[in-house]
């Protein structure tokens, strides 16, 4: 499903642990790392797509995570010309993404990159909060900077908000910011993580 402007609707997923680190995934057969992400199918909400992608790409179930926040706006990036498929109709020029911030509440042993026949990732690790902004492929960097800045403003408060999973993605950004989590983060969790 591609919109009138040529962007494919997509969800992006940032999973944090209790130390304030984020899950960073290695694309299969490449030395390229990114957050889990995936397209939204027809007749599927952004939230439904997020949970489907969460399971397909990292093997986690809804019970393994707590939804903390949803980005207020759709964020877009354009694909480089070398990645465009000029023969496809309609042509996709990039992705427009709704981003979800999740906290891992289950066991990290449940993370499994091989839940499908064609996995997206073949490795993962925990990295410091801001590490992905500097390390992601250049054409995604602006989106990563915006989403991490938005998520940081949530996580750096004494009471980070959570989202009620029963609401649709459209209303998530409004309602998500009014609920609060029991986990309290401080700024130091995100600036220095061991090994980074």
Swiss-Prot record:
Residues 6-149 form the Nudix hydrolase domain. GO terms for molecular function: mRNA 5'-diphosphatase activity. The keyword DNA repair does not apply. CDD domains: NUDIX_Ap4A_hydrolase_plant_like. One of its GO terms (cellular component) is cytoplasm. Its EC number is 3.6.1.-. A motif (Nudix box) lies at residues 38-59. Residues 167-184 have a biased composition (Polar residues). Residues 185-196 have a biased composition (Basic residues). Its cofactor is a divalent metal cation. GO terms for biological process: mRNA catabolic process. Residues 166-196 are annotated as: Disordered. Keywords: Hydrolase. InterPro entries: Nudix_hydrolase, NUDIX_hydrolase-like_dom_sf, NUDIX_hydrolase_CS, NUDIX_hydrolase_dom, RppH. The keyword Lipid biosynthesis does not apply. Belongs to the Nudix hydrolase family. RppH subfamily. Accelerates the degradation of transcripts by removing pyrophosphate from the 5'-end of triphosphorylated RNA, leading to a more labile monophosphorylated state that can stimulate subsequent ribonuclease cleavage. This is RNA pyrophosphohydrolase. It comes from Haemophilus influenzae (strain 86-028NP).
């Amino acid at each position: 499903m591609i919109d009138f402007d040529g962007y494919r609707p997509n969800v992006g997923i940032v999973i944090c642990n209790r130390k304030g680190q984020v899950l960073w995934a290695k694309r299969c057969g490449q030395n390229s790392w990114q957050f889990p992400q995936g397209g939204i199918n027809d007749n599927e909400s952004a939230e439904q797509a997020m949970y489907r992608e969460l399971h397909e790409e990292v093997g986690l179930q809804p019970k393994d995570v707590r939804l903390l926040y949803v980005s207020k706006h759709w964020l877009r990036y354009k694909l480089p010309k070398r990645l465009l498929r000029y023969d496809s109709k309609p042509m996709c020029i990039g992705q427009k993404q709704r981003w979800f911030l999740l906290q891992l509440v289950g066991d990290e042993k449940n993370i499994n990159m091989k839940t499908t026949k064609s996995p997206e990732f073949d490795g993962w690790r925990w990295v410091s909060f801001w590490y992905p902004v500097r390390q992601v492929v250049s054409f995604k960097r602006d989106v990563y900077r915006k989403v991490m800045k938005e998520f940081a403003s949530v996580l750096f408060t004494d009471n980070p908000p959570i989202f009620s999973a029963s609401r649709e993605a459209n209303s998530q950004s409004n309602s998500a910011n009014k609920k609060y989590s029991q986990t309290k983060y401080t700024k130091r969790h995100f600036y220095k993580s061991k090994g980074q």
